[in-house]
From Swiss-Prot:
Cell cycle listed as a keyword: yes
The gene coding this protein: mau2
Matches recorded under SUPFAM superfamilies: TPR-like
Subcellular location: Nucleus, Nucleoplasm
Oligomeric and partner information: Interacts with one or more paralogs of nipbl to form the cohesin loading complex.
Chain positions of TPR repeats: 102-135, 374-407, 453-486, 493-526
Broad class of where this protein is predominantly found: nucleus
Protein name, UniProt field: MAU2 chromatid cohesion factor homolog
Similarity-based family: Belongs to the SCC4/mau-2 family.
Job description of the protein: Plays an important role in the loading of the cohesin complex on to DNA. Plays a role in sister chromatid cohesion and normal progression through prometaphase.
One Pfam family, short name: Cohesin_load
Amino acid sequence: MSVMAATAVVSPQAEASESWYLALLGFAEHFRTSSPPKIRLCVHCLQAVFQFKPPQRIEARTHLQLGSVLYHHTKNSELARQHLEKAWFISQQIPQFEDVKFEAASLLSELYCQENSVDAAKPLLRKAIQISQQTPYWHCRLLFQLAQLHTLEKDLVSACDLLGVGAEYARVVGSEYTRALFLLSKGMLLLMERKLQEVHPLLTLCGQIVENWQGNPIQKESLRVFFLVLQVTHYLDAGQVKSVKPCLKQLQQCIQTISTLHDDEILPSNPADLFHWLPKEHMCVLVYLVTVMHSMQAGYLEKAQKYTDKALMQLEKLKMLDSSPILSSFQVILLEHIIMCRLVTGHKATALQEISQLCQLCQQSPRLFSNHAAQLHTLLGLYCISVNCMDNAEAQFTTALRLTTHQELWTFIVTNLASVYIREGNRHQELYALLERINPDHNFPVSSHCLRAAAFYIRGLFSFFQGRYNEAKRFLRETLKMSNAEDLNRLTACSLVLLGHIFYVLGNHRESNNMVVPAMQLASKIPDMSVQLWSSALLRDLNKACGNNIDAHEAAQMHQNFSQQLLQDHIEACSLPEHNLITWTDGSPPVQFQAQNGPTTSLASLL
């Protein structure tokens, strides 16, 4: 907060006429905005105000200014807290002093949270909310702040209640824009809680409010982006990759519209409308991110790579000027997705270096590490499968299961752990227990179309290894039906090649060929290196069995090329120091196993 900004709202002549006060304030602001800032001198100027035994209004405002400067520009949180507590205490005794009173409450509760004194922040915010009902801007802002605090504590029920209160208050004070923000925020939390029956009517209402609201074009489009992001993520959570396409297209058009609008100062007539969801640049990265999520699920991995590169470039530019924690969250989620892409496309060494980079990013923030530790271990488990370290894969997935409460992630991990047990071939008891928990025919734990299709595939794979071919075909045809319905290309390719293998074993070469050829075409399009390797081996054997020697030779050559590429990448990955991360299953990742100079990826120059 600018220390001079306060003078713009100082109405009593007692403040404005004190020339000593204005002079000290001017010096303080000069030192604060110097390049580099001279914070110590700024603080001295503000402290000097107290030497003049100022009136209560100046005293309270100066405590707020000192607390703000110390909080934002120094590590002296104790002194910042003392000044903010005094500002809050004194300002409550002064009538019509809302700007200082509620700014102090907001900043002080933020500081309490930073010091892990959440129990001090909550009653402070509740008191401020209680006495701010005649000040729409501050009442809404404080409700948002307390809801966010509850969300960070994973108390989503209390957060939803507060957002509901905020939505009703915004309606009463005639702010449909801020009502939509409260409702969309509540919808986001309901999606996180998987309360889908409550989400659908709420999103329908939000859609109507957004379309009917006539106001600033950037604010209107930002509401539409928020609304569409919720719809897209809802579809993606449900694994409905094809159904989401119209919404995703609308979202991409919407962000293009926003990028053409001028960032004029928004000065709404209703003070309750003085909010925005995200800066335009952040929204742009978010749209890239959901596009990457869609491309990853659909199996368009080159497209996922392209949008990841664009998003990471944008993020690096933004992070030079903006320390907002959401940017680090975006970066982490992007890396999580691109790592999975690398493992599929046969770039294990690069994936491993990016896992190391992810570890470093998460270690910069305890909250980031807490929120993404399960994903980190899951990615390491997937890497372990790719380099055939099955014991380590099991340890990583078991650790990830211990750390997650997210049902979709839990199901994803269990599905992959089941594939590890199938490959090991001697873990039948554990495997049966796992398969019972992800039975796609009965009480499947999540509503995700994609994960249910994957569960059918895992059942088919297990039946194949046990020689129960008719049962395997039933499961795989179910996977094919589901994956074709939603354009899940990787699952389609995997199911086709496994069906082709079954028909080959049964001696039905024609039917096998009908499965393997499209599997190979689809795997090349993705590109999925493992399925290409498997398909080329089958094509070689099929053509040899049918006496097609030229085709058999061509397929053998392809298989040899894929084998060489994968072997070379395997050797490179296992020789990296980061490979030792596969043994990490507890606490923070060991620093000695991480690359100290960052990854040498295609993005090295940008990162």
